[in-house]
Amino acid sequence: MAMLGKRRPPRTANERVRRERGSATRRDDATADGLSIERLAHDGRGVARDPHGKTVFVDQALPGERVRVAVHRQRKRFDEAHVVERLATSPERATPPCAYYGRCGGCDLQHLDLEAQREHKRRTLDELFTRQGLTLPEIEVLAGEGLAYRRRARLGVKCDAEGTPHLGFRARGSEHLIDIDSCVVLEPVLSRLIAPLRACLVQLEAPRRVGHIELIATAEGACVVVRQLREVPGDEARWRRFAAEHDVTLAWRVGREAPTLRWLHAPRGEALHVTLVLDDTTLSLGCVPGDFLQINADVNARLVRTALAWLAPRGEERVLDLFAGVGNFTLALAPRVASITGIEGSPAMVERLADNARRAGLHQVGAQQSDLATQVPEVAAVDWVIMDPPRGGAEALCRALADSPVTTLLYVSCDPAALARDAARLVQGGYRIQRAALADMFPHTAHLESMLLLTRDTPRGRSTSVEREDHGQGP
């Protein structure tokens, strides 16, 4: 978001590095012969030890490489460093496909071969479960293209001292903006809008009133959502012209405290749609800007298809889909089971889930609103539970499920550490991990999506609606 009131030009990544490193940067004579990179940390940085045994995290260094480094941040237990000279190069090193890589903070693994990235993520998932005393079965890797995969992104906007607007992504670990003209991981329909959007910002009466710009690729084409901190009538007309000229849908999200969505160039029915391609059908999911959508449409479809294959429904199961969103798993599973109820915290998304089910003719779908951070739903009459919680996981839900009669659980997670923690609680409750998958939803980053199938033969007990003891806190 724009930092209002700051009267200075946005720093480039190089300026930021010089400022941060400044007096903190040092070259130890003891490391003149270089450090050997032993492994990758979970966040993708190389891990070495200096001659004194202190751990050093090295940006963009790979296992097997020997590097001379400069330390730019010293901590009590470890140092953080960057490469000054590479003395030996890993065969897994790749040429980054992006001209902005190393400055832009959007990607952090473009210097590593794509297959090696996936192996690193597989090891990360396995290590996190080992720390919990758990052994995973063979991890299936679900992967698609490495570039042009991202169907949603948020671009920062900032004006310099002269009032010139800049558009791009933040530098890694910083609020400083990296100006870009394109992005190789965005779907092309979105990437080619970046330069025209910057040109439009330059023409605005009040570009400082734009906080950020969100881009979404939908069945209707590209959608642009402008975070407008305050209405500017003249700029509204300019954005309308931009939408018409570039054949995009466009909305303002206006206001500071509780911004409202207002369409300036609306899709038919003021609803967008994304498609979910399954083996035997293609589903259309209605959504609006702000609804949760998986970033990678192709890998999301692979994830859902894998879930259906693992579960192998016979048409008689009663299913609960928690954190259901607009129906990603709910609608895919509905024709194959006796009944399925999607539960979601957002009332608006619950309405869209119900509408999506009606449009698809799926009468066995129920949609309910519930704050799953504070309330565990009734599961006594349920055979299967599916859940795809936010990054913090679902610790309270897993405690309740461990003592419930549910025998089959499909758990999708965007945080492998939270998944490992929750899986340990479920295993204590008698579940067994039957299948595991890594979904490479975010190629060229250290982020990973994962999925488990857990089953047990004998239920632990009867379940009722259970209030969390720490009422009011998130999962």
From Swiss-Prot:
Record-level GO BP terms: rRNA base methylation
Pfam families in UniProt: TRAM, tRNA_U5-meth_tr
Biased amino acid composition, Basic residues: 1-10
A GO molecular function held by the record: rRNA (uridine-C5-)-methyltransferase activity
UniProt biased composition (Basic and acidic residues): 13-30, 457-475
Domain of life: Bacteria
Reactions this protein catalyses: uridine(1939) in 23S rRNA + S-adenosyl-L-methionine = 5-methyluridine(1939) in 23S rRNA + S-adenosyl-L-homocysteine + H(+)
Family annotation (InterPro entries): 23S_rRNA_MeTrfase_RlmD, NA-bd_OB-fold, SAM-dependent_MTases_sf, TRAM_dom, U5_MeTrfase_fam
Active-site residues, Swiss-Prot/TrEMBL: C414
Keyword terms, alphabetized: 4Fe-4S, Iron, Iron-sulfur, Metal-binding, Methyltransferase, rRNA processing, S-adenosyl-L-methionine, Transferase
Domain TRAM span(s) in chain numbering: 26-85
Protein name per Swiss-Prot or TrEMBL: 23S rRNA (uracil(1939)-C(5))-methyltransferase RlmD
Organism listed in the record: Chromohalobacter salexigens (strain ATCC BAA-138 / DSM 3043 / CIP 106854 / NCIMB 13768 / 1H11)
Gene this protein is translated from: rlmD
